[in-house]
Amino acid sequence: MALSIHDKKIIVSKINKISNTALSAVTADLQGVCVNKINELRKSGREVGVKMSIVQNTLLSLAIKNTVFECLKKKLKGSTFIAYSMIHPGSGARLFKEFSKKNTQFKITGAAFEGKLLSILEINQLADMPTYKEAIIKLLLTWKMLIAGKLIYTLSAIKQKKETS
């Protein structure tokens, strides 16, 4: 059943609002992927703050017009599945990357971050970027190792000083 103009305007408005607040966007071709798997992907996306939708390319290109994701227009071909990362810039890319490993038909077609169209290498880097929590944990572990190293160095210096005295 075809959508009315009113329904199309609502879809464009909704996607445009999401586009204006999202940190990054990733598009994929889901041709040949089972609906149940897509629903599982959407469920896991909601848990990490990723908003996903399947939108007609014409409506999507209208929705992303005059946003930082306008550069994605070049990548809109076939059935487009778009994921907007709302909390962490790499969430959508990480989710799609993991999903494409398990489902070979699922192909990541493009991504945009800070108004720039990303290459496949940059999409992988965005997906591998640690979350805020992971970055803090790594920083604390580094500090812990540095403090432990300084303590060992200080204790060995005291030991050497006592041995020479």
Curated annotation (Swiss-Prot):
Pfam families tied to this protein: Ribosomal_L10
Gene for this chain: rplJ
Endpoints of the signal sequence: none
Domain of life: Bacteria
UniProt name for this protein: Large ribosomal subunit protein uL10
SUPFAM superfamilies noted in UniProt: Ribosomal protein L10-like
Lineage, opening ranks: Bacteria, Pseudomonadati, Pseudomonadota, Gammaproteobacteria, Enterobacterales
Function: Forms part of the ribosomal stalk, playing a central role in the interaction of the ribosome with GTP-bound translation factors.
InterPro entries the UniProt entry points to: Ribosomal_uL10, Ribosomal_uL10-like_sf, Ribosomal_uL10_bac, Ribosomal_uL10_bac_type, Ribosomal_uL10_CS_bac
Keyword Ribosomal protein attached: yes
PROSITE patterns on file: RIBOSOMAL_L10
PANTHER family attached to this UniProt entry: 39S RIBOSOMAL PROTEIN L10, MITOCHONDRIAL
Keywords: Ribonucleoprotein, Ribosomal protein, RNA-binding, rRNA-binding
GO molecular function terms noted in the UniProt entry: large ribosomal subunit rRNA binding; structural constituent of ribosome
Gene Ontology biological process: translation
Quaternary data: Part of the ribosomal stalk of the 50S ribosomal subunit. The N-terminus interacts with L11 and the large rRNA to form the base of the stalk. The C-terminus forms an elongated spine to which L12 dimers bind in a sequential fashion forming a multimeric L10(L12)X complex.
Keyword Endoplasmic reticulum set for record: no
Gene Ontology terms: cellular component: large ribosomal subunit
Similarity comment: Belongs to the universal ribosomal protein uL10 family.
